[in-house]
Amino acid sequence: MSSEILSVAVFVPLPGQEEQALSTVRELSGVLAAGGYSRDVLYRGPDEYVLVRFWKSDECRRAAMENPSAQKCWAKLAHEIRILKVHESLEEIQL
């Protein structure tokens, strides 16, 4: 099993904010990848977006929370999206 920590966020852009929200999500994903904290995959459903984030470790997740560039992106997103559901940590089950 992987040592990565899987997090999932389901969100919708606020009215008139879709383009800016996606730009901010891309910026945040780039910051987190460049810092070696995580890797992201973004999916789109008919009415919502699903962001799947694979944190490299719990330590990386904590360190990312202190990164000024990441903090700036999260602050911007607070005005651009409405979060419908968040799974901070999902556990992999052996099949």
Regions found by a protein language model. Give the residues of each.
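Short, low-order "capping/linker" segments at domain edges
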Residues: 90-95
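Feature marks short, surface-exposed loop/turn motifs that line or immediately flank catalytic pockets
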Residues: 15, 46, 58-59
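Short beta-strand
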Residues: 40-44
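An amphipathic, aromatic/His-enriched active-site/gating alpha helix that lines ligand/cofactor pockets
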Residues: 27-39, 54-88
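Short structural boundary motif marking the start of a folded domain
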Residues: 3-7
